[in-house]
C-alpha cells in the first residue's frame, strides 16, 4: 500500500537523524484505520535538532514531492507531547490502548497522583503504563494514558482481569470525577 510505504520511508529518515521512530496502525476506537507515526526523544533539544536535520534531508523532500503529485492520505500534526509519568520502553510494545481525558489544568496534579496506583495494578498483569500531556497541540487540557501489552492475547487477558478489579474500577470512577474521557483507541505496532 502506497501510504504505508511512504510512512515507513519517512520514519526511516526520522530515525536516521536521531528519532526513536515508531509506526502504529489504529485498529479500533478513535481514528480507527488511521496510522500514527510517533517519534520519541530524550529532550526537546534532541527533538529540535532532529527536526531541523530531517527537514533538510533530500529523501524527505522527495517523499513530499511524490505526495504532492500523487496523494495517498492526509497528514495531521505534528503535535508535541511530554512524558509526565512512566517512561516508554526502549523496545516498543506491540499493542497499545490509549485513553484521552480532558483534564482542567487545576486538576492535573490530582489526576497524576493516581498514576502510581494505576501502574501497580497493571504490573500485576505484566503491563506498563505511560502518561503524556501536550506541549504543542490543539487542546492543552488533554491527558493521554497509554497501556502497553506484549500481544493481543495479553491485552485480552489483562482487560478481563482489570474490568473485574474493584480497585481499577474505583480509579476509573475517580478519574471521571477529575476529568472526562474523550477518546480511546487500540493500536498495533507495524
Each model region followed by its residue ranges:
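Short S/T/G/P-rich N-terminal loop/turn motif that feeds into the first structured element of a domain
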Residues: 1-190
Amino acid at each position: 500500500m502506497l501510504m504505508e510505504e511512504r510512512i515507513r520511508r519517512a520514519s526511516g529518515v526520522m530515525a536516521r537523524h536521531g528519532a526513536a521512530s515508531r509506526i502504529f496502525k489504529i485498529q479500533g476506537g478513535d481514528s480507527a484505520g488511521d496510522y500514527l507515526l510517533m517519534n520519541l526523544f530524550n529532550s526537546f533539544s534532541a527533538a529540535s535538532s532532529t527536526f531541523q536535520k530531517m527537514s533538510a534531508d533530500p529523501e524527505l523532500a522527495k517523499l513530499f514531492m511524490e505526495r504532492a503529485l500523487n496523494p495517498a492520505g492526509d497528514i495531521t500534526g505534528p503535535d508535541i507531547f511530554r512524558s509526565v509519568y512512566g517512561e516508554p520502553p526502549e523496545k516498543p510494545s506491540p499493542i497499545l490502548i490509549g485513553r484521552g481525558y480532558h483534564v482542567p489544568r487545576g486538576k492535573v496534579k490530582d489526576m497524576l497522583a493516581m498514576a502510581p496506583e494505576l501502574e501497580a495494578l497493571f504490573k500485576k498483569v505484566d503491563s506498563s503504563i505511560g502518561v503524556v500531556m501536550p506541549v504543542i497541540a490543539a487542546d492543552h487540557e488533554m491527558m493521554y494514558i497509554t497501556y502497553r501489552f506484549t500481544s493481543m492475547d495479553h491485552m485480552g487477558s489483562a482487560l478481563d482481569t482489570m474490568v473485574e478489579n474493584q480497585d481499577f474500577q474505583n480509579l476509573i470512577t475517580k478519574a471521571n470525577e477529575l476529568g472526562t474521557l474523550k477518546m480511546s483507541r487500540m493500536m498495533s505496532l507495524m
